Amino acid sequence: MKNLSFLINRRKENTSDSNVYPGKAKSHEPSWIEMDDQTKKDGLDIVHVEFSPDTRAPSDSNKVITEIFDATEDAKEADESERGMPLATALNTYPKAAAWSLLVSTTLIMEGYDTAILGAFYALPIFQRKFGSQNDKTGEWEISASWQIGLTLCYMAGEIVGLQLTGPSVDLVGNRYTLIIALFFLAAFTFILYFCNSLGMIAVGQALCGMPWGCFQCLTVSYASEICPLALRYYLTTYSNLCWLFGQLFAAGIMKNSQKKYADSELGYKLPFALQWILPVPLALGIFFAPESPWWLVKKGRFDEARRSLRRTLSGKGPEKEILVTLEVDKIKVTIDKEKRLTSKEGSYSDCFEDKINRRRTRITCLCWAGQATCGSILIGYSTYFYEKAGVSTEMSFTFSIIQYCLGICATFLSWWASKYFGRYDLYAFGLAFQTIVFFIIGGLGCSSTHGSKMGSGSLLMAVAFFYNLGIAPVVFCLVSEMPSSRLRTKTIILARNTYNVVSIICSVLILYQLNSKKWNWGAKSGFFWGVLCFCTLIWAVVDLPETAGKTFVEINELFKLGVSARKFKSTKVDPFVVKNTPKYVSHNDPKGDIEASIAEE
């Protein structure tokens, strides 16, 4: 990492240079917007400036060029500093950024919790008798496959709507207020679930609650990636997966308690719904005091607020902190400016498919997240129901679910350690490979009806959960934040998550048909199907998923711009701040050529 004292000294030298001509009135210092207008008017991208030994005092126009040069140099220094920053230094420098990111991501606990209890309700006796029907052949009570599919479709449809509403809401009021509004609506919609007396009311409640969940899915990832440096990006984006698991673990514990103590009481399903009121208010208060994303503020031209936001994420004080703030703001400006020059329009959903570069980035982001569904993870969400249909007792099914989520949490922590030695693609691909093997073994055990094979298939589903949370589950949250451009990040993540939701709907329907005794009744033999689909996802990853570990946002932008193939991303080195073979330009305000600038035509 560049020595910070070097950056401070260079800044001090620049400050002293501004006082060389004490008799001259202080000239107007151009803002970034003015500098950007100047370069656009000339159709130039200033890269390098040279002053001859006998140069006169710079004019205002030439100071514009000098300021642009300094901003680009600052951006380069900040980018190099971020790329080489050790984890310990990042934690010491950005502890508040990490804390704010953890707070925002905690909203996902509620989604993981509620989606898990919905699947567990299907195995809860009181819920089965209250809302289900009796199987004439087996005499067992269960929720019909059509209603299970309907309830799943409702909350996923709500998430799709919520995600689409998140885009314009963020453009209008920012990340913080969008999250606060979503938390308010979630608390209100939970009343419908608590007072439900029919599956229809549950369907309405799930659909309405799905809208704020969709908001959480998008903004937790984008906020974490924008507020934290590269060294912390993997840990804080993948923390989203931990929040999902914490929510699912809480749900499994609550449902086991309901199955044990309230098996014949309406509290068995009302109490789990009521517990959703615990988090919205404290989270909303915390997020109200959180800093807004500096990337969002810079895109809105609110540079002073972006600096204040960055100051609130950094530790320390004095000149070192101010220089870090200035360098980071300059880097964000340069990155966004380079993206804006590709199009004059404000970022929209259509821009995600506008050209070959953005189409590729959008495709990879969408398929990357869809891989979480096609790898068989939806089966993990219905684990309690799966265990029961595989022949495991109801009480043991809930116990298996708790063990499964604990293994998932351990696996996610292990992925943090593994990320230091393996890349994003490595974890994604290796996780898929292991899951494929285990699914085929589960399918084979499903062909036997012995007690040992039933317990074996249940145990191996826990192995699937472990490898899933070691590989594809956490790394996806990091990858989807790195693939899009900063200008289109929120909208691309929304499209990707909605792709996941649509694919999840299809996978959920298939799983419910595979497990329901009135439909296909495959049981553990469904492992064969998910093994094949998981293998297909692995093939896509090998062909199309690039390695972004150790790459800053501006480097990733350049690699996509150059059309580097997926498997060469890791080995290709780029310098986004250098333009080669540039023609010469002499300023109109300096006809003698005292100031020479190397430029590149747009």
Curated annotation (Swiss-Prot):
GO biological process: maltose metabolic process
Main location group: membrane
Keyword list, A-Z: Cell membrane, Maltose metabolism, Membrane, Sugar transport, Transmembrane, Transmembrane helix, Transport
Residues annotated as transmembrane: 107-127, 143-163, 179-199, 201-221, 235-255, 271-291, 364-384, 398-418, 427-447, 460-480, 493-513, 526-546
Disulfide bond sites: none
GO CC term (a single one): plasma membrane
GO molecular function: carbohydrate:proton symporter activity
One Pfam family in the UniProt entry: Sugar_tr
Localization in the cell: Cell membrane
Induction of synthesis: By maltose and maltotriose. Repressed by glucose.
SUPFAM superfamilies the record matches: MFS general substrate transporter (SSF103473)
Membrane-related topology note: Multi-pass membrane protein
Topological region Extracellular: 128-142, 200, 256-270, 385-397, 448-459, 514-525
Stretches of the chain found on the membrane's Cytoplasmic side: 1-106, 164-178, 222-234, 292-363, 419-426, 481-492, 547-602
Function in brief: High-affinity uptake of maltose and maltotriose. Also transports alpha-methylglucoside, glucose and turanose but not melezitose or trehalose.
Family, per entry: Belongs to the major facilitator superfamily. Sugar transporter (TC 2.A.1.1) family.
NCBIfam families, alphabetized: SP
The protein, known as: Alpha-glucosides permease MPH3
Gene designation: MPH3
